């Protein structure tokens, strides 16, 4: 396994172009199996989660053709199975979107329980199951495989989600697309990638209204047809690079963003003392002087995203004063705190609250990523720290960040991906 080696303490300058949204891509790719025709999808981030999904579709018999670095064609017309139980499915959480897609197309599904980031224990799918059952499917889990039987027909209904689950909202939308009648999802998730999925499905012939609000209405159609779609920019990737500037200093133009999606993030960075300016579909962030303490609580969109909580916390380790970070979405999302303490951070965690007392400097150290966003937080800390930081388990990071080493190098960062046995001295020489 390779690792990242970062020689920190250098401010970041230049431009970074944001890739397509990973969270949108991993919902749209499974949706393509419902389409009777060829889907051409642009602005796909070629991160490991996406590559795994594309390989799953190939295993299932779909035609998958990579046109260029960010464009893929998917042809599911030859797909004749509703079973996805290989080990690949267990490697990523979003593989469970195949349940809704298979139910929509075949009225049945067998899908292996998913993997992915391991914070918070096993991610529950009870809201997914509740939604499928309300549509008329019989659900059970056998030997780690989710089995769904909708052979008696799926019928539209009203579904109220106990929590505004992104995963459940996606899965129910997929299953309801070709159900009989109208389905109404109340307390639906409102994240940008929910809207993007709805726009994709509508462009293929679905009838979905209200995505982006807490009530989504889906009127079932008889079939979806092929077409072209371009995925939105990645809100979380953009926020990660902005948090890196807040930590390390400098001035960076973050290109290819939707500024409205960034409001909750830019507000907190401005509160810390960063200068923020919007330029069409670009945002410039500048941090020259010291940053300041803030309080932040993660919430469902349009609140501050849980997927940016670790990265912001890393930047707050160097802010003046004592900051308070409250996690309002997931359990056990402060596992990165032990690694930041190895670098000199003063961070104390009590349940869902982290209290961060800013320090004058962080010091490079060997650390280990425990999940995708925790790994991004360690990269940010390493960029700002004095000395050398070595990050192991970088596979987590590459699940969600396309070309992260190359993008950071273009901003002036001294970061390398090296073989695990290679010394930092050799990496520096390269």
Stretch-by-stretch model annotation:
Residues 1-430:
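Short, structured segments at the rim of ligand-binding sites
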């Amino acid at each position: 396994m390779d690792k990242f080696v970062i020689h920190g303490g250098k401010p970041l300058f230049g431009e970074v172009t944001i890739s397509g949204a990973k969270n949108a891509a991993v919902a749209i790719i499974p949706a393509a199996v419902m389409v009777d025709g060829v889907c051409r999808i642009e602005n796909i981030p070629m991160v490991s989660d996406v590559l795994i999904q594309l390989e799953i579709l190939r295993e299932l018999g779909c035609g998958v053709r990579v046109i260029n670095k960010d464009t893929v064609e998917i042809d599911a017309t030859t797909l004749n199975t509703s079973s996805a139980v290989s080990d690949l499915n267990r490697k990523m959480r979003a593989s469970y979107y195949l349940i809704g897609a298979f139910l929509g197309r075949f009225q049945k599904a067998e899908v292996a329980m998913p993997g992915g980031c391991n914070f918070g224990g096993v991610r529950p799918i009870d809201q997914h199951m509740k939604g499928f059952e309300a549509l008329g499917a019989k659900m059970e889990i056998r030997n780690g495989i989710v089995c769904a039987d909708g052979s008696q027909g799926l019928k539209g209904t009203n579904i109220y989600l106990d929590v505004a689950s992104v995963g459940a909202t996606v899965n129910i939308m997929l299953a309801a697309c070709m159900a009989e009648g109208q389905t109404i999802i109340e307390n639906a998730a409102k994240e940008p990638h929910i809207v993007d999925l709805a726009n994709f499905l509508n462009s293929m012939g679905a009838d979905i209204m209200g995505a982006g609000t807490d009530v989504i209405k889906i009127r079932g159609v008889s079939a979806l047809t092929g077409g072209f779609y371009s995925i939105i920019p990645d809100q979380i990737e953009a926020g990660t690079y902005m948090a890196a500037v807040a930590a390390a200093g400098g001035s960076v133009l973050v290109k290819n963003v939707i500024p409205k999606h960034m409001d909750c993030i830019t507000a907190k960075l401005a509160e810390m003392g960063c200068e923020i300016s919007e330029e069409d579909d670009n945002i410039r962030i500048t941090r020259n002087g010291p940053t300041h303490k803030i309080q932040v609580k993660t919430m469902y969109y349009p609140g501050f995203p849980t997927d940016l909580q670790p990265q912001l916390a890393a930047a707050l380790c160097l802010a003046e004063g004592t900051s308070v970070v409250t996690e309002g979405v997931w359990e056990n999302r402060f596992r990165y705190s032990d690694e930041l303490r190895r670098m000199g951070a003063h961070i104390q965690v009590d349940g869902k609250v982290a209290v961060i007392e800013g320090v004058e400097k962080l010091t490079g150290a060997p650390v280990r990523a425990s999940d995708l966003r925790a790994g991004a937080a360690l990269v940010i800390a390493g960029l700002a720290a004095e000395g050398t930081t070595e990050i192991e388990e970088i596979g987590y990071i590459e699940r969600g960040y396309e070309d992260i080493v190359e993008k950071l190098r273009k901003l002036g960062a001294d970061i390398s991906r090296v073989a695990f046995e290679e010394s930092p001295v050799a990496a520096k020489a390269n």
